Amino acid sequence: MGFADLWYSHPRKYGQGSRFCRACSNNHGMIRKYGLNICRQCFREYAKDIGFRKLD
């Protein structure tokens, strides 16, 4: 049993550890609204492609 098996052996079905960014697999700074499930860094990169636009 290696270190990774011990460290991540607990099942992650709910909570912050269960959600990952669909673009980069990061789990920090998640935007879950509207079912985006994307981290804030990737959102800034892909927002225009998704259809969001900045309002002045």
Curated annotation (Swiss-Prot):
Encoding gene per record: RpS29
Cofactor dependence: Zn(2+)
Binding site for Zn(2+): 21, 24, 39, 42
InterPro entries attached to this UniProt entry: Ribosomal_uS14, Ribosomal_uS14_CS, RIbosomal_uS14_euk_arc, Ribosomal_uS14_sf
Gene3D superfamilies for the chain: 30s Ribosomal Protein S14, Chain N (4.10.830.10)
Database matches in PROSITE patterns: RIBOSOMAL_S14
Cofactor note: Binds 1 zinc ion per subunit.
GO MF terms, alphabetically ordered: structural constituent of ribosome; zinc ion binding
Keyword terms, alphabetized: Cytoplasm, Endoplasmic reticulum, Metal-binding, Ribonucleoprotein, Ribosomal protein, Zinc
Tagged with keyword Cytoplasm: yes
Provenance organism: Culex quinquefasciatus (Southern house mosquito)
Highest rank taxon of the organism: Eukaryota
Protein name, UniProt field: Small ribosomal subunit protein uS14
